[in-house]
Each structure stands twice: as structure tokens, then as C-alpha cells.
Amino acid sequence: MTNEAVKQSARRRLACALGTVAMAGTLALAQPNWGTGLGRTVSRDPAPGQGSRDPSPDIKSLHVQGNVWMLVGAASNAVLQVGNDGVLVVDTMTDGLADKMIAEIRKIAGDKPIRYIVNTHVHADHTGGNEKVAAAGQSIIAGNFAGQVGQEAASFASVIAHENVLNRMSAPTGKEASRPLKAWPTDTFFTEDKDLYFNGEGIQLIHIPAAHTDGDVMVYFRKSDVIAAGDLFITTLFPPVDMAAGGNYKGVLTALNRIIDITIPRDKQEGGTYVVPGHGRLTDEADVVDYRDMATVIRDRFQDAIKRGQTLEQVKAAKLVRDYEGRYGANSGPWTTDQFVEAVYRSLTAAAPSSTATTPPKAPAPTQGRGGRK
């Protein structure tokens, strides 16, 4: 066995061990409180590990490759990019783990400032530490942006997210905001992607609409060749779909295929582009392909049942996912098999959104009259 093969094998053993820590924490979190006004599906917590009860206070770290590190906590995974420019953090776990997360960042990065935080979506197990982690950082202020406003802005890391994350955090409908003001994103975008250049490499923030939620972003570190997938991809359970937050199973499949489009495997389909899931162990393209294939087979089975007119109860009784339950199913906890089956069925039977708001009305068809068209 070559030295490189030994390194690959050791990396996979460590990644699997870290994944076991993450999965143990995930299954211990059953009914977190997401606050008010988030709907039935969210109140049952579809995304694994959400909430403030952290059964294990430890955070483990793993150097993935290049500038990128993976942090594994009981609630979720986070990602660091560390270099001469400072630190970029992808997701901040929970408020209860924020102090330990900051301490782990200091172990890895020393006194390098936390410059950016990227939220992959709105859920509290990925954004709960925003306020504390941002306060431990420092923004890059350029030009003539000075005075009190500039000084105050510079004393926090910039929090980047899709605008739908801010919309849901700030409760624009007039209801009480679900998060403190200082936890909200400070830099949002509404386009398909956003680009950064930090620590000597290009970073792509890729938005996948209507997938796990309506504000999902995957982060691709181009030089390091690592993707932080958030909850668009997990290894512990069936794909979580928060329909109350704009999610849809069809979008999850789109996200998985997009990840596969980006990843390039190394020798024997191992290594190459690494993918850090929102929950679970470190993975590569082959792992995502396996997960995508499972999700696609399930979609096809449900579509066939729906075409034959089966109701949700009939689909549940048919147990169309039973051959995958041993690996991804759960009878209790944050995301059960029944919740998954219901989300897939409702996603595939939901009416297509009206296009009248974005598509101009068609011009009336020309009529034939004397002398030609008029």
C-alpha cells in the first residue's frame, strides 16, 4: 500500500469516527423549540439535530484538505477556511455550542480574525451561534467607511446568507422575530450564486431554491476542492425537507445532482473533491452518488404510486422505502421515516406555482382579415 493510500485510509477511519459522534448527538435531539409561527413540520424539527439541547459538549475537528477544516458537534457540522486573510466559518452550530466552537477555531487558527460567516440555511442548529461567533470576529472595512458606524460594523464578522434566510429570521410579517437582531445576516444575496475571493482561493456560494428550505446555499472552496453542503446532503437519515420553510423534495434531488456535477473523484473513486454534509461523516463523490441514487429510486416509486392514484395513507402502508430504512430510517427523533414519506408525497403532489407573476401575458393571436393579418 502506498503512502498516499495509507493517508486516505486513515482519513476515512477518522472521518467515520467523527461521523459516529455527530450521529449520536443527532439522534439524541428529539423535540427542540424553534419558537413560534414556524408551522407543524418545522415544529417537529425535520432537520437533524436542531435545537439548544446539546448532549455532548465536545467539538471535534478534522483537517480536510487545503485551507479547509471540518468541525463536528452534537448539533451539526461546521466548516472553517483558514489562511493569511483570516477565517471564514460556514455555519455556527447552536447557541449552546458557540463558545466551544470559538475555542476550537482559536486552536486551529490562532489569533487570525474571523472575517466571514456563511449560513447554509435558516435552521437553528446551523445558525444558533451566529451572534456569539460574529461578535468574536472582525469585518474587513475598506475605503472611507469610518466613524462610529464603521467602527461598530468592523467589530463583528460579516454574516452572509441568501435573502430568504434573513426574511425568515427577521419575521417580516409583523410577528415577533425568531432570532435576535445581532444573529441576522448582514450581507445577503438573491441571485443564483455569489462569489468571494478569500485566503488565496475563489469561493462559490451556490443557491438551490426550494430544496431543504427556500434559502439553501452550498459553499464550494475551489482551490481546496471542498464543498460544504449544509443540509442539502446528510449521511445519517433520509433527506430532510422542511416544506413549511419553502422546501421541496424535487429541489433536494437538484441539489444532490449539482454537488455531483462539481465533484471530481481521485483514484478508484475515492478522495478528490470532499463534501462536508450538514450532519454525519466526511464524504466524497461516491458517497453523494449513493445517496442521490437512493433518493431518486424513492422518487420514482412515489411517482408511480401517485400516477396510480394512491393516497398518502396507501403509500405509507405500501412501505415504499423499507429497503432503505435500516440505513436511513428512524421511528423517533428529529426526522422520522413517516415524516420523510409525507414530505416526499406532498412534494410530488403539490401544484406547480403560478407563473402569472413573472411571465407576461401572451399577445392575442393574430386574426386573418381582408388584406392580410391585422
Predicted regions and their residues:
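Accessory terminal helices/loops
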Residues: 4, 28-49, 140-142, 265-272, ...
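Bacterial N-terminal signal peptides that target proteins for export
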Residues: 4-18
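Zn-dependent metallo-beta-lactamase
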Residues: 20, 26-85
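Conserved beta-strand hairpin/beta-sheet module of binuclear metal-dependent hydrolase folds
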Residues: 60-112, 217-230
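Active-site metal-binding motif and surrounding structural segment of the metallo-beta-lactamase
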Residues: 61, 84-88, 96-149, 155-157
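Metallo-beta-lactamase
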Residues: 63, 86-87, 94-96, 150-208, 213-214, 222-223, ...
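Divalent metal-coordination and catalytic microenvironments
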Residues: 67, 81, 91, 105, ...
